[in-house]
Amino acid sequence: MPEHDHRAVEETAVHSGEPSARTDANTPAMSNLDSVPAEPLTASARNPQTTPALDEPVTWPSKVFDPHHPPADELINECVHCGFCLPTCPTYLLWHEEMDSPRGRIYLMKMGLEGEVDRMDDTYVRHFDQCLGCMACVSACPSGVKYDRLIESTRAQLERHYQRPLLDRLFRALIFSVFPYPARLRALLLPMWLYQRSGLRWLLHRLGLLKLLPKQLQAMEALLPEVSLRTIFSSPLPERVLPQGKPRLKVGLILGCVQRTLFAEVNAATVRVLAAEGCEVVIPRLQGCCGALSMHAGREREGLRFARRMIRAFEREQVDRIAVNAAGCGSNLKDYGVLLRDDRRYAERARRFSEKCKDVTEILAELEPQAERHPLPLRVAYHDSCHLQHAMGVRSEPRKLLAGIPELEVLEVAEAAICCGSAGIYNLVEPVPAGQLGERKARNVSATKPDVVVSGNPGCLLQIESSLARIGKPVPTMHTVQLLDASLSGTWGKG
């Protein structure tokens, strides 16, 4: 079992009944978490979310959660502790620690909700921080436990009540002051290009100076995509693109933050493919960040502010569908109706908005192809993004579209349900487990001997490309719509 110097205290592992070898004897154990029962956990008769009788005093038993959308007791009690989630959980696969599995984290939520945890200390928070939020457990669960709702509620509570170490706070502040703001990201493109093309990057690697940086900054540097002058000086897409041939749908396009800045060619390809299939494409200029990174990190107020702005931007256009080409954004956009359920002004508007949101492959798959596909003689390894396959339930549509390209061979990757380690900002704030998962995914991808790796999420593409390079097996990566665009244009291999 690998050593993890960042884990101060470990609990008893349910699968073995033996104390963890990684327990630090010098660190005081958190009360009530020193020993975890190995038998199935029974539901408590106490339910803090039950409305008390009028003559009873209103009490709140939790010492770590406030009453604003804590992890819901009724959702917690749906877990029957069967263990079907364990083989699909990335952190459980790495460490085989019960408290780093969905089942264990749900037990920790229950303890916190029922007042059995005295304070939100480092050990308690660490188990939730190490969850990637990949939702593989949601797909695997036979009881239909909504772990996605539970971890989202828990993370919002952590952000409100737990003060992180100073360096962690500063690093997260850096991330959230840049990533959700496309204009700020764009301002960094020229410095990134100079860093890559001036020889400075090569020199720092050659001298080993990057190893002096904190692991989080090393991870951020390793994930930098190649920046070209074309990317820096690319023109914005037009606000409206007319369909080719008979109009079939009016589709709004979500530009994304990282997508429009570092992967502008993916958005351009998306517009061309949709137009070729008879879709009028509308791109509202006022759209900003969708709030996905914020919501997944527990920054609820910030995420909801972004969501309201996005809804307002698209309400001005009467579209049939709203296309998303970044799976992490898509899963959040489809949840607007739930996220804004308490907002009287936006609840219904959010519900209508979410109903229109689809991954671009869903929209294309529902349309019978009208544009000619040219052959692409390639072996393509398709990577299922977690938020696409688990959160949005989109698995067959990308494969159907790729199968429609003549001479293209789609290769299935082993452990397709296991996360690549990207997971939003996870590979930045948790670089060690993210790196282990990235290399595991890279080895599985490399085993298929592909010409190209294809996925529907920019974070996955960066993570897999970086991981393949790290194991010495570099392979080009592309978004699904880029491959479709190449087939429609017939320009593959023509320079």
Predicted stretch roles:
Residues 6-52:
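N-terminal intrinsically disordered, low-complexity tails
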Residues 24, 28, 37, 44, ...:
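Residue-level signal for mature regions of secreted extracellular proteins and peptides
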Residues 83-87, 97-102, 280-283:
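N-terminal glycine-rich anion-binding loops that anchor highly charged ligand groups
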Residues 2-3, 30-35, 40-44, 48, ...:
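N-terminal glycine-rich, Lys/His-bearing helix-loop that initiates the first secondary-structure elements
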Residues 73-92, 121-145, 387, 417:
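Cysteine-centered iron-sulfur cluster-binding motifs in ferredoxin-type domains/subunits
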Residues 47-65, 92-126, 144-173, 473-483:
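Non-heme iron-sulfur electron-transfer modules
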Residues 147-495:
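Iron-sulfur cluster-binding electron-transfer modules in prokaryotic oxidoreductases
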Residues 63-76, 117-128, 242, 275-277, ...:
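Short, intrinsically disordered, charge-biased short linear motifs at domain edges
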